């Protein structure tokens, strides 16, 4: 299962050493395939696409991040492109029929 995991810096900036440790940690997770990719935001922070077998595994991964308590997290489970489209389309058709009366 893939997850979008975003970290936004909090009000307390890390030390340069903490920052370096976090970057090394991210590089290691990209190198070992834990993250498919990692991108930064212009204003600070960034996101990655990770592979985890469960929500708990995604949480455990986040808790390992050296700046865990210094960032605000956003986590979203992802679907493969077109996965579930049949369900969405069926619900749209159902709603359209209901509106037509």
Predicted regions and their residues:
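Conserved, structured core segments of small domains
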Residues: 1-101
